[in-house]
């Protein structure tokens, strides 16, 4: 690795430690030329699949949109941040673990609905109203009946 101080190509690793989360490695390096020390961090480069939108366009996966979707649905709901983060992490793991290069926005939306269903039924209904483009009160009533008639500990809605 190039030294940030003198630009020399030759540096050596003095110490390596895994972070508390285990997601990155901290390395202390020393330049062979100027002998100054510096720290680098090594992380895994995650390649998410491209998202195929309903209109057929392909876009890069944007995790901020995922966070925003959860934040809007859960606005002023009594759901701990840790539970929300865990739900988002499960979706990210599904995306990474899918092994596909492209995935439909519909699939991601269904995963979000499943997670929201487990977290908070009101948030689930909020998200469903936008995601499924509710047009009248009857659409809301149908989803509310679905939520009320399903088992309390169910894994989620039937799609």
Swiss-Prot record:
A zinc finger (unnamed) spans 3-34. Residues 49-139 form the ATP-cone domain. Keywords: ATP-binding, DNA-binding, Metal-binding, Nucleotide-binding, Repressor, Transcription, Transcription regulation, Zinc, Zinc-finger. Its cofactor is Zn(2+). Binds 1 zinc ion. Signal peptide: none annotated. It comes from the Bacteria. One of its GO terms (molecular function) is DNA binding. The keyword Transcription regulation applies. GO terms for biological process: negative regulation of DNA-templated transcription. NCBIfam families: transcriptional regulator NrdR (TIGR00244). Negatively regulates transcription of bacterial ribonucleotide reductase nrd genes and operons by binding to NrdR-boxes. PANTHER family: TRANSCRIPTIONAL REPRESSOR NRDR. Belongs to the NrdR family. This is Transcriptional repressor NrdR. It comes from Nitrosomonas europaea (strain ATCC 19718 / CIP 103999 / KCTC 2705 / NBRC 14298).
